[in-house]
Amino acid sequence: MSLREITSPDEIRDTRSFSHLEWGAFLSIDDYNHREEIVLGHTPMCKNRLKSWGLYIEDGTRVAACETLERPALVQCKDGKIKSTSTFSIGAVFTPKEHRGKGYASVMMKQMASGIPFKPTLTDADIIKATGVSDVDQTLRVTPLWSDVGTFYEKFGWIGTTDLQYVFEVDGSASQNGVNGTPNGTNGTNGVNGHTNGTNGHSSAVKYLSEEDVYRLADVEASSFASDFEKFPFKGSYKCGIVPDRTVYEWHLARAKFLAKFAKVPEPKVFGAQIGDSWMAWHHMYNARELVILRAKLAKAEDLVELIAAAKNHLCKDGFSDQINKIILWEQEREWNHIVDGLSYDAIDQAIEKSQGKREHRGSSIPAVMFVEYKLQKDAMEFVDHGKLTWC
């Protein structure tokens, strides 16, 4: 059996005809191909960085497939030096029903773990521009994935982390927790570029964020990522983090806008909220019935209450609450705000409790990571700042 890159457009579409059964959601196969090729395939994050791979048996039959996505990242070494490199995220791991139960997925992942597909296409200049770190070391290449099958991938060397998250229910009423204003960005003075009248009795204004607002904030955060990343402690020999630049947001928001008509909801115009120096950006996941927080940057823990209330208000007033009934915040956002922004865990927990959030295990999309170089795979490494934003 051999692992090979799938380069033929026709074979890539044929591969999608199988994965569509798992991830097609509301889409026909034609719409699914359009989303992958045109809507997402041409986003800067995917263009020339997304590759398809197939496992082939001796007669040439493709029995399993997956995708890899190359993105710039930082790695801090045991000597304290920070270097930039490429990560190769693995997604869309799929075995057609007729080939299941024969160990093909295991064979494919063993071959993926051997490093066959992980040849960098990003130039050093691309990586330096994205990371701000001029010391590029591609021997430190990393391959993350987000497991939907528990600890399955750990036997091939991937190191799993937490699947803890916080869930905030949305009851569909016109106003949530005292939030006022109309966030939809089309009518009234409280649109995307306007402000609400404050939430929960606070006088501070909450601003709803347009797509461009989110990109502007992402640019600011990406420029400080190296210094923020350095603050994050690690117990092992290495730590790794994918750069949270605007290209990652572009991919998520393009999905949400494209899928809206198929989910029979308005195309979203609001993608986050901000109060003072605190902000969050979100992604509408209609098939999961979730508004997932891509990023939460908190100057004060109590601002989380305002931002969650604003998110609930957006869902209720902008016509999404019939399709989306919960807000999801991954545990990694709590960790990042505690370490990088110096907020106490207790204060964040109190804000989550005040927002009626509950902590639970996701059971899916479990972040895991491994070095590409075999000689490094036995070294302990921590995957930091790997919330929903960098999921793929």
From Swiss-Prot:
Reaction(s) this enzyme catalyzes, per UniProt: L-lysine + acetyl-CoA = N(6)-acetyl-L-lysine + CoA + H(+)
Q: Which UniProt keywords apply?
A: Acyltransferase, Transferase
Q: What class of enzyme is it?
A: transferase
Q: Which InterPro entries match?
A: Acyl_CoA_acyltransferase (IPR016181), GNAT_LYC1-like (IPR055100), LAT (IPR053013)
GO biological process: one example: L-lysine catabolic process to glutarate, by acetylation
Q: What is its EC number?
A: 2.3.1.306
Q: Name one GO molecular function term.
A: L-lysine N6-acetyltransferase
Regulation of its function: Activity is inhibited by 5-aminovalerate.
- Report if keyword Repeat is assigned: no
Q: In which pathway does it act?
A: Amino-acid degradation; L-lysine degradation via acetylation pathway; glutarate from L-lysine: step 1/6
List the Pfam families: GNAT_LYC1-like (PF22998)
Function field: Lysine N-6-acetyl transferase (LAT) that catalyzes the first step of the lysine degradation pathway.
Q: What is this protein called?
A: Lysine acetyltransferase
Source organism (scientific name): Yarrowia lipolytica (strain CLIB 122 / E 150) (Yeast)
- Could you read off the lineage of the organism from its UniProt record? Eukaryota, Fungi, Dikarya, Ascomycota, Saccharomycotina
